[in-house]
Regions:
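Auxiliary alpha/beta "docking" domains used to position bulky ligands
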Residues: 1-149
Length: 149
C-alpha cells in the first residue's frame, strides 16, 4: 500500500500544518546558477557556511540521492502576542515568541515521515528544517506554496 499525495496532505493537516505541497525531486539548474552567482558576488555577507556545502545546496541529489519527492510545509508561528505586550524598548520577531520552531517542525515532520513509512518499508526520507543544505524556498515554490522574489 502506498499513500496518495492527498492522503499525505491530509495527514500533514492533522499534524497542524496549514500549508502542504509536494514536488517531484529534480535538478533546478537555474536556481543553482542563481545561488552560485549570489555567492560569487559575496551577497551572503557573514553567512560563510552557505558556501561550505553549495554543491549539496544547489542540487538536491548531491545531498539526498534517493530523493523522489519533496514535501514542503508551512506552519503559522503567530502566538497572539504583540510588541506592546513586552512593554519594552526592544522587539522580538514573531518566530521567537513561542517554542523553538526547529524542534516543533522537526517533531511534526518526523511524525509525518514515520507515518509515510507505514506504507512501505522501502520509503527513505530525511527531515530538514532550516539547517540542512537544502534550498527550502525553491522547493516550496516547486510545491506550489509561493514564489521567490
Amino acid at each position: 500500500m502506498s499513500f496518495t499525495s492527498f492522503q499525505i496532505k491530509e495527514k500533514a493537516r492533522e499534524l497542524g500544518f496549514q500549508k502542504i505541497g509536494i514536488a517531484k525531486a529534480k535538478e533546478c539548474p537555474d536556481d543553482q546558477n542563481n545561488l552560485n552567482n549570489w555567492l560569487e558576488e559575496d551577497r551572503n555577507g557573514t553567512m560563510v557556511w552557505i558556501n561550505n556545502r553549495k554543491e549539496e545546496r544547489g542540487n538536491l541529489f548531491n545531498y539526498f540521492p534517493e530523493a523522489k519527492s519533496v514535501i514542503s510545509v508551512g506552519l503559522n508561528y503567530y502566538v497572539g502576542k504583540t510588541q506592546e505586550d513586552l512593554n519594552a524598548d526592544y522587539k522580538f520577531s514573531n518566530y521567537a515568541w513561542g517554542d523553538d520552531y526547529h524542534k516543533v517542525l522537526k517533531e511534526k515532520l518526523f511524525n509525518l515521515l514515520n507515518w509515510i513509512k507505514i506504507s512501505s518499508s522501502e520509503v527513505k526520507g530525511i527531515v530538514c528544517v532550516d539547517t540542512a543544505p537544502v534550498m527550502e524556498k525553491v522547493w516550496a515554490r516547486e510545491a506550489g506554496l509561493g514564489w521567490i522574489g
